A protein has these predicted regions:
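Interdomain boundary/hinge segments at the C-termini of tandem beta-sandwich modules
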Residues: 22-26
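Aromatic sugar-binding surface patches on proteins
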Residues: 1
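Glycan-recognition and catalytic cores of secretory/periplasmic carbohydrate-active enzymes
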Residues: 4-19, 29-408
Length: 408
């Protein structure tokens, strides 16, 4: 039965309580896929968002960032083209470390939607108004917008600049062309930003190689150059000047090295097909990384080791590493399910902090990923319950996907 409904509790014709209006339909969740992807579109920097695509949030292009100066702390003359990319969550800075984790997550989604699309026969596609191929097309377009900004952020020596930032905090306003008067600068070149770049761009090679092979090879070449720079500069700290932007401080580099190495290994950058001596011992270093960086429940810009574990679990070059990674991640999935079963809200988090809904969503993503090679109804049900929390089944009675429900 399809339609919009409301549940009422009544006593002798008197309504004592009633639910919100809810809809039963085939394509509610797929519609949310397009809606959540659109949130990245609204974060685009340096381009116009026209009314036919952005609606009431339409705006002219601003913050072109195609000729910006270096921060004085870099002791560097000249200017740099850092056009494009996504704004951060709460300011008009553009950052590699958190942008990289976001784009890496979207690349995983792109990889799995390609597999899912291949599994669907023509009849199932014809009978479903939701187009997975159209979603993937939009997804790849959004991913590429950020990746092209990433490529512009790589210096000639292979290192990657940390962020683009205004010199002071902007007000809570929509960016306009007049904001060009607000001076913006490029800051730092760190080990974390460079390795984050390497991991994300190596993953991009896999996703884009059947879409645009030239762009895919450009991504892989850039990833290798970044990794080699990081080997020569293994502990260059993040820029500590945070005026006008977020710090995103992280002085632990093991997890980023693991992610970058695992992704390069997955892409076949091994001793037998790469001449550069810096890449000939990837497997040996990965074995060390696996001991240093066990998988965790979390996945964010500060803790990226799970992306390394996932890369090893999905690769097929080395079945021994694949088995080790899959077993380790299955333990994580079991821990998530156990913690959720002990929680009144069926969540695996134990603190509600800024961005904790992202932790909930990442737990669900982790369960769905691991379910692809270790199928378990408990993983699927737990992940669905976490999505229910995001979609409105929570103590504050609010859907956390803005613009998607009566209260969001």
């Amino acid at each position: 039965m399809k339609g919009k409904f409301k549940i009422c509790v009544n006593d002798s014709g008197k309504i004592l309580a009633e639910s919100h209006i809810f809809e039963i339909a085939e394509n509610i969740v797929p519609d949310l896929l397009f809606l959540t992807l659109k949130s990245f579109y609204f974060q685009r920097s340096g381009v116009e968002l026209p009314t036919d695509k952005a609606g009431k949030w339409a705006r002219p292009k601003a913050h072109l960032d195609d000729c910006i100066e270096f921060h004085p702390s870099m002791n560097r003359k000249g200017s740099w083209n850092a056009h494009g990319g996504w704004y951060d969550a709460g300011d008009y800075g553009k950052y590699i470390v958190n942008g990289g984790v976001s784009v890496a997550t979207l690349l995983l989604v792109a990889e799995f939607t390609e597999k899912r699309n291949a599994d669907l026969d023509e009849n199932s596609l014809a009978n479903n108004s939701f187009s997975l191929s159209l979603f993937r097309e939009n997804l790849l377009d959004e991913i590429r917008f950020e990746l092209e900004f990433f490529l512009r952020m790589q210096d000639t020596d292979g290192g990657v600049f940390f962020k683009v930032s205004p010199i002071r905090w902007d007000g809570f306003v929509t960016p306009t062309e007049s904001d060009e008067a607000q001076k913006r600068q490029i800051l730092g070149k760190s080990t974390t930003s460079t390795l984050n770049f390497a991991g994300a761009l190596a993953e991009a090679h896999r996703v884009f190689q059947n879409v645009d092979s030239t762009f895919a090879e450009q991504c892989l070449t850039a990833a290798i150059r970044a990794y080699i720079w990081a080997l020569k500069n293994p502990d260059v700290t993040y820029p500590h000047n945070t005026e006008g932007s977020g710090g995103y401080g992280d002085e632990r580099y093991d997890d980023e090295f693991f992610w970058a190495r695992a992704m390069l290994f997955r892409e076949g950058v091994k001793s037998e097909n790469v001449l550069n001596s810096s890449l000939k011992n990837l497997r040996d270093l990965i074995l060390v990384d696996m001991k240093k960086c066990p998988p965790s429940l979390g996945l964010d810009w500060r803790d990226t080791q799970n992306l390394g574990w996932i890369a090893l679990a999905l690769q097929s070059y080395d079945l021994d590493l694949q088995t080790k990674a899959r077993n380790a991640l299955k333990t994580v999935a079991d821990d998530i399910v156990r913690l959720a079963s002990e929680d009144a809200y069926h969540l695996a988090i134990r603190r509600f902090v800024w961005g904790s809904n992202g932790d909930v969503a990442n737990h669900a993503l982790t369960l769905f990923l691991i379910n692809s090679w270790a199928p378990s109804l408990s993983y699927v049900n737990c992940a669905k319950t976490m999505l229910d929390f995001i979609f409105g089944k929570n103590p504050v009675d609010r859907c956390f996907v803005t613009g998607s429900a009566w209260s969001s």
